[in-house]
Amino acid sequence: MNLRPEEISSIIRQQIDKYQAQIELTDVGTVIQVGDGIARVYGLMDCMSMELLEFPGGVLGMALNLEEDNIGCVILGPYKHIKEGDTVKRTGRIVSVPVGDALIGRVVNPLGQPLDGKGPVNSDKYRPVEVIAPGVIYRKPVHQALQTGIKAVDSMIPIGRGQRELILGDRQTGKTAIAVDAIINQRGGDVICIYVAVGQKQSTVANVVQKLTETGAMDYTIVVSATASDPAPLLFIAPFAGAAMGEEFMWQGRHVLIVYDDLSKQAAAYRELSLLLRRPPGREAYPGDVFNLHSRLLERACKLDDQFGGGSMTALPIIETQAGDVSAYIPTNVISITDGQIYLEPDLFYAGIRPAINVGISVSRVGGAAQVRAMRQVAGRLRLDLAQYRELAAFAQFGADLDKATQARLIRGDRMTELLKQGQYVPMPVEDQVMSIFAGTNGYLDDLPVEKVLPFEAEFLKYMKTNKPHIGETIRRTGQLKDVEQELHAAVEAFKKEFKAAHGLE
């Protein structure tokens, strides 16, 4: 094959004509100090707050302090190889996470990277972890119930879609159990659940994921995990990452339940970062803006107005108290931000009353408007009666002579306390709750021994499903009791006679 010189020269000329020098501008800075997961970077004058920065080895950092002559940056990964004088590049991106249906059923870290060994998350849509919460114009009052399946909660401390309900108590009092039960109870419904584990042991998170998988709840749940061994910055952004994932569904007009387990560990991680960044400490050494940290997170949970899709995000933040002290800094902050709180008491827990809810200081400030009407009818005075019963029971311990009305109240209180006990991972449908509490508040249990209350409930609900299924169906469909109230009275009376005869209580 012969190549003529003029052909070669013409090809070279064409290549030269097509050549364009592409100049790429990269904003770079220099590490001037590094240690304890914090880097001080000089030279990135146009850097944004919460922007991702790239360190050598592909490790990412997040700009938190924007000062006159340098940037305080937290490193989101291993930092032993980073040293003074290293080059840092801007990415131009605020910290963002993948969002959408591809995340459902997955366990991811706060950056959206998978932890479950099921391959990459196939989502091409991202949302920044920090956004401003929807304003008043976008919102609608809470009016739809979110059933947790827990009798004590749905009857006395009802939660509505778009509400923020705090769960607080000492360690090992059943806080996570209430949240996980609420997630399991959404099975078969239209609610997507997000469980954000902050600063937990890996074994604890694995147990929760296993239980959600066994009950089929992972089919509609996302787990965001930042464990105790992860760097503090990941613990700090984990709740925000979960909120961003939930907002995507909320703005699509869907309903989300998000659990932050727990925010006291996020506050501790934020305190660690703030002190390392030399921010001035305040009460209990927390930075001055720790209230803002939690308020801007929890304000993102809301019920959207119908013109914006009518979606909702319900938040269940969890706070751990120390020796029952609800007046500490972080608990009081979050109590004032949320729409109510469920307080779990160690004494009740150890007495076998589980869930160990102290009805005296637990409250739902907006959930009453969302409560199923049938439940409101049967449980209207239940919370007040139980709170009074606790006071009377304490008084009766002194052996004082009690009048008949007080004795009747103590008898009723004993049986209602027993009736509200419930095992873990066995949420109850709302129609069963209504029928069960109906029997208690109408005095049908008053002449039964306390130890027979739960067997009575189990057999009664079985009897209703077998012999009178239309009553439960009517309550579930209409949410009202008026059409079946007389029939329900008759059914309880008929069953009670059978129960007494079978158990030799005549």
From Swiss-Prot:
GO terms for cellular component: plasma membrane; proton-transporting ATP synthase complex. It catalyses: ATP + H2O + 4 H(+)(in) = ADP + phosphate + 5 H(+)(out). ATP binds at residues 169-176. The keyword Zinc does not apply. Its EC number is 7.1.2.2. Pfam families: ATP-synt_ab, ATP-synt_ab_C, ATP-synt_ab_N. One of its GO terms (molecular function) is ADP binding. Keywords: ATP synthesis, ATP-binding, Cell membrane, CF(1), Hydrogen ion transport, Ion transport, Membrane, Nucleotide-binding, Translocase, Transport. It is found in: Cell membrane. CDD domains: ATP-synt_F1_alpha_C (cd18113), ATP-synt_F1_alpha_N (cd18116), F1-ATPase_alpha_CD (cd01132). Its main location: membrane. It is an enzyme of class 7 (translocase). Disulfide bonds: none annotated. The record marks 362 as: Required for activity. InterPro entries: ATP_synth_asu-like_sf, ATP_synth_asu_C, ATP_synth_asu_C_sf, ATP_synth_F1_a_nt-bd_dom, ATP_synth_F1_asu, ATPase_a/bsu_AS, ATPase_F1/V1/A1_a/bsu_N, ATPase_F1/V1/A1_a/bsu_N_sf. HAMAP family: ATP_synth_alpha_bact. F-type ATPases have 2 components, CF(1) - the catalytic core - and CF(0) - the membrane proton channel. CF(1) has five subunits: alpha(3), beta(3), gamma(1), delta(1), epsilon(1). CF(0) has three main subunits: a(1), b(2) and c(9-12). The alpha and beta chains form an alternating ring which encloses part of the gamma chain. CF(1) is attached to CF(0) by a central stalk formed by the gamma and epsilon chains, while a peripheral stalk is formed by the delta and b chains. Belongs to the ATPase alpha/beta chains family. This is ATP synthase subunit alpha.
